[in-house]
């Protein structure tokens, strides 16, 4: 009887380890983004900008798009209702001083800021040329649904 309990415990422990390893591997994965719909919408935008070619979730689609003289904004989502909003502005994006911000590197030579939590979002900000970029992930339950590294990889994919 004792041997049977040990075998069951070992099997359960093994299953838990396999699930956790699989989750952590898939969590950091990036997916190619078919940006043709966003690129077509950008043809009418008031200024030229870069767009992401990689996203942290599979099958992201354009949900919303808007632009004016100072800003381009679009939101991507998928069937699991994971939302990413991209803002591209001519003016710097200001956040209150009391919000925790972390300095980050995007690629080799771009400095940015990472905000782990603000109003139900994880945010990354950076400047490229004369434009300011922001990616905001609206999480459903907790901020750990997306990692800082995934946001940085998405920022690095802007072309």
Where in the sequence are the language-model features?
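Short linear interaction motif-like sites in intrinsically disordered regions of transcription factors
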Residues: 1-2, 24, 127
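A short, sequence-level motif marking secondary-structure junctions
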Residues: 14, 88-94, 138-141
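Membrane-interface motif at the C-terminal end of an N-terminal transmembrane signal
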Residues: 18-32
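Short, solvent-exposed recognition patches
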Residues: 28-123, 128-129
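Short hydrophobic beta-strand segments that form the core of ligand-binding sensory/regulatory domains
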Residues: 132-136
